[in-house]
Structure formats: C-alpha cells, structure tokens
Amino acid sequence: MADSHGNAKGATAHTEAGGGHKAPFPPFQKDTFASQLVSLTIAFVALYLISSRLALPRVRKTIDDRQNKIEGDIAQAQTLKNESDAALKAYEVELAAARTRAQAIGNETREKLNAEADTERKALEKRLSAKLADAEKTIASTRTAAMSNVRGIASDAATAIVQQLTGAMPDRKLVDSAVEASMKG
C-alpha cells in the first residue's frame, strides 16, 4: 500500500541515504558548490544583460515618455493659466472702464433730467405765479366791487333804519359819510 506521500512501502525519501543517515542539503554540498556558484553567476550576468539591454531600456523609455507627457501637460496647463489670468485682467480692466462709463452716463443723464425738471418747475412756477397774480387781481377787483356794494348796501340799510326809527328820511350825504367813517374804523 502507498503511504500518504505516494511512496511505496519500504521506500526511502530521496534525501535520505541508506541506513537512515541524512545527506546534506544539495546546494550546500561541498562537491557541487563551486559549479553552482559559476552557474549562478552566469545566470545573474545573463539576466542582468538581458534586462539591461532589453527590458530596462523599454521601461526607461516608458518612464521618459510619461515624464515628458506630464511635463508637456504641466507646461500647457501653465500656458492656459497664464492666458486665463491675462483674460481675467483684461476683463477686470474692461469691467472697470464699463463701470466708469456707466457712472458717467448715469451722472450725465441725472444732470440732464435735473436740468429739464428745473426748467419745467420754473415754467410751472411762472405759470402759477401768473395765475396767482391774475387770481389776486380778480380777488382785489371783486373785493373792491364788493366793498363798493357794501357801502351802497350799508348806506341803504342805514337810511332804512333811520327812516324806520325816526320816521323821516335822513340826508343821503350825511348817511354816506357816517358809513364811510364806520368802515374806516
């Protein structure tokens, strides 16, 4: 029957020497040590030459290409940043100029509208002053007419009162002078 390692019963492992004595680990055997060092040196030199002549230049080229691409992208980004900064400065200058022009236009328009409003106000004041003067003249003439009518009415009323009280008709000049004296105060 086979054991758990697949060996036939009674067979020994390849590292065991006959009689139960173990042989040293093969790479450390004195007989093969020098040839193993030479083989190892040849393998490392061959691996170094292959990698330094074939693989490493490709890796270096890939790294250099990647570095150049990154540097190019950074340079392009810096150029675009400089252009955008210049555009921003130009925009700010134009914006400031536009604000100044808008302020000037606003001031000019305000002054123009104020001048027009002053002109209209003065014309309106002049018309109102003329109407007021006309109204005052009308009031004065109406007052004068009313006062002259009041004198006549007062004279007529005084004459009628004196006639009622005394039964005789008073002198018209005397009544007019009495009314005039009482109106003057």
Swiss-Prot record:
Main localization (coarse): membrane
One cellular component term from this protein's GO annotations in UniProt: plasma membrane
CDD domains: ATP-synt_Fo_b (cd06503)
Membrane topology listed for this record: Single-pass membrane protein
Molecular function per GO: proton-transporting ATP synthase activity, rotational mechanism; proton-transporting ATPase activity, rotational mechanism
Keywords assigned: ATP synthesis, Cell inner membrane, Cell membrane, CF(0), Hydrogen ion transport, Ion transport, Membrane, Transmembrane, Transmembrane helix, Transport
Subcellular location per the Swiss-Prot or TrEMBL entry: Cell inner membrane
Keyword Cell membrane: yes
Transmembrane segments: 34-56
Segments of this protein annotated with the region Disordered: 1-24
Function according to Swiss-Prot or TrEMBL: F(1)F(0) ATP synthase produces ATP from ADP in the presence of a proton or sodium gradient. F-type ATPases consist of two structural domains, F(1) containing the extramembraneous catalytic core and F(0) containing the membrane proton channel, linked together by a central stalk and a peripheral stalk. During catalysis, ATP synthesis in the catalytic domain of F(1) is coupled via a rotary mechanism of the central stalk subunits to proton translocation. Component of the F(0) channel, it forms part of the peripheral stalk, linking F(1) to F(0). The b'-subunit is a diverged and duplicated form of b found in plants and photosynthetic bacteria.
Record text on subunit structure and interactions: F-type ATPases have 2 components, F(1) - the catalytic core - and F(0) - the membrane proton channel. F(1) has five subunits: alpha(3), beta(3), gamma(1), delta(1), epsilon(1). F(0) has three main subunits: a(1), b(2) and c(10-14). The alpha and beta chains form an alternating ring which encloses part of the gamma chain. F(1) is attached to F(0) by a central stalk formed by the gamma and epsilon chains, while a peripheral stalk is formed by the delta and b chains.
Family: Belongs to the ATPase B chain family.
The protein, known as: ATP synthase subunit b 2
Source organism: Nitrobacter hamburgensis (strain DSM 10229 / NCIMB 13809 / X14)
